[in-house]
Regions:
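Loop-to-transmembrane-helix entry motif
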Residues: 1-6, 36-40, 77-84, 158, ...
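Hydrophobic alpha-helical transmembrane bundles that constitute the permease/transmembrane domains
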Residues: 10-14, 81-88, 165-168
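Helix-loop-helix junctions within the multi-pass membrane cores of secondary transporters/permeases
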Residues: 38-121, 175, 187-193
């Protein structure tokens, strides 16, 4: 579970965000990730999207060239509702627990897990390990034992750090894409090495 989740989160971070930046904003993902390095490390150490907002805002505005009008709206909203790392964790954790306790899930249950993971991740607080709390809702909805959440809690601290880094980089990527679409991106600042 741990290795798979880290792989999927890193894949989402590097591949999905790179494609979004290239396709929707025609921006170099390597420059983006290099400039977001310190923000990702700060998010990793705090495990809180909310605590990372000031650092993210400064980097998005000063280093990535997003105008303050866009960044001051997109980053806080993203820190509140953009929890894609959490949605990935909840889906994989539910499937891991089902497999561990010997429950075969139906296609309808898989669809329900995906739907609930997305919805609950939007409502998850931007504080450490909040996604694990909402995982109980998903487990209960597909009839899995809630006490199995202990399997996840044992390793969740490190995984939460990775999830938060993914979430925060997503906030910054969306800020760049929105800024580019609104002509509020200073590409010279973005491309400045």
């Amino acid at each position: 579970y741990v290795i798979l989740l880290i792989f999927v989160l890193l894949f989402h971070l590097t591949v999905t965000y790179s494609l979004l930046l290239k396709l929707f904003a025609n921006l170099n993902p390597l420059i983006f990730f290099r400039k977001m390095r310190n923000v990702a490390l700060f998010a990793f150490s705090t495990s809180s999207s909310a605590a990372t907002i000031p650092v993210t805002l400064k980097t998005v505005t000063d280093d990535l060239g997003v105008k303050k009008d866009v960044s001051s709206f997109v980053v806080p909203v993203g820190a509140t509702i953009n929890m894609d790392g959490t949605a990935i964790m909840q889906g994989l954790a539910t499937m891991f627990i089902a497999s561990t306790v010997g429950v075969d899930l139906t296609f309808a249950q898989y669809a329900q897990i995906v739907f609930l993971a997305i919805i609950t991740s939007i409502g998850t607080a931007a504080v450490p390990s909040a996604g694990t709390v909402t995982l109980a809702l998903i487990l209960g909805s597909v009839g899995l034992p809630l006490d199995a959440i202990g399997l996840i809690l044992a390793v969740d601290r490190i995984l939460d750090m990775v999830r938060t880094s993914v979430n925060v980089c997503g906030d910054a990527a969306v800020s760049c894409i929105v800024a580019k679409s609104e002509n509020e991106l200073d590409e010279q600042t973005f491309n400045n090495r």
